[in-house]
Amino acid sequence: MVDRPVIQYVVEEGLASGADEVVIVNSRDKKSIEKHFSPDTELVATLRARGKDAYADEVERVGNLNVSYVYQDEPLGLGHAIHCAAEKTADEPFFVLLGDVIVPDNNICPRMLEVSRAHGGASVIAVLPVPDEQVHRFGIIDGAPVEGENGVWKVNSLVEKPALEDAPSNLSVFGRYLLSARVMELLADAKPTVGGEIQLTDALDAVLAEEEMYAVVISDEDGFDTGTVETWLDTNNKLYARKNG
């Protein structure tokens, strides 16, 4: 994405949020991701010998980011992938950052953490307003604005890809979550549902019956989608303009 892999944006966002460690849920055959975040003394030495110290510094920095890995041996859904990292979260709240969206200014997770702390450690999700014609493509929240808290909603329920006439709002789940430890417990007992997969949405619905959940409304200037060819190209253009404007 312009000058770095999408996964690097996501890792750097996670570390900038104050997380102690970024855990990548990987498949065992995707060694290129692990290589990217591993020290490469040979490449660093070659770059320095050629007078490319700035590039060498960047390779060195990326190779020393605090990243670890767990493996999802079967593609059993997002909920299953998250639970693969259960031992890493150690019964504590945790962020989930999906790799098909990026937040170049690293400004969403700190806001989510602030809202969670203001509401007793509640789970918080990021949501993005979408046009009516796109509502059916996303998970949509049902809820209401919190009085006195600009851009914060209390979530009542989540509706997965509703028809426009059934949508309770136009606020789509964006791919940034700050989740309580209870969500991980629920994922441990979750059964496959749609498509034979373990869905995160099911665990979020279950936790809503026990705990409060809030949403932080973001704008399309805060986060960018890379999940389709069209959005990938659009995001590249926007980021290039930002860097060279």
Enumerate the predicted regions with their spans.
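Conserved N-terminal catalytic core of the sugar/cofactor nucleotidyltransferase
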Residues: 4-93, 103-107
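Short, surface-exposed amphipathic charged segments that create phosphate/polyanion-binding patches used
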Residues: 83-86, 138-143, 173-174, 230-234
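Active-site acidic Asp-centered loop
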Residues: 97-99
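Conserved core of the sugar-phosphate nucleotidyltransferase
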Residues: 103-185, 190, 194
